[in-house]
């Protein structure tokens, strides 16, 4: 599975966890069916293990927004991206940012992709 697909599947799992208060294992199982992808699982597990810290990074960068006003898709995608940016050294920040914008265009809308771009641009140093 390519990393883009792993990110999309991770977003879907995080969305299920957020929306349905589903367990991490059940969400991964629902999304992956009989497949397995280590990177996808690493993303979901990493976001959930560091959720409070990730939210603390996101919240001050929302510019007149509150986290409880964000759509579940946008919030899940921001968490996923912040995890990649701050916790994984093998993904350049620019790649994570661009992937998030493209995934937002698929699962959310143009307005959300611009919003996500703005939030992540404040969070992600460009030199990694």
UniProtKB/Swiss-Prot annotation:
InterPro entries membership: NusB-like_sf, NusB_fam, NusB_RsmB_TIM44
Disulphide bridges, residue numbers: none
Superkingdom field: Bacteria
Gene Ontology CC annotation, any one: cytosol
Assigned keywords, A-Z: RNA-binding, Transcription, Transcription antitermination, Transcription regulation
Record's keyword annotation contains Transcription: yes
Similarity-based family: Belongs to the NusB family.
Protein name in the entry: Transcription antitermination protein NusB
Species this chain originates from: Listeria welshimeri serovar 6b (strain ATCC 35897 / DSM 20650 / CCUG 15529 / CIP 8149 / NCTC 11857 / SLCC 5334 / V8)
Species classification: Bacteria, Bacillati, Bacillota, Bacilli, Bacillales
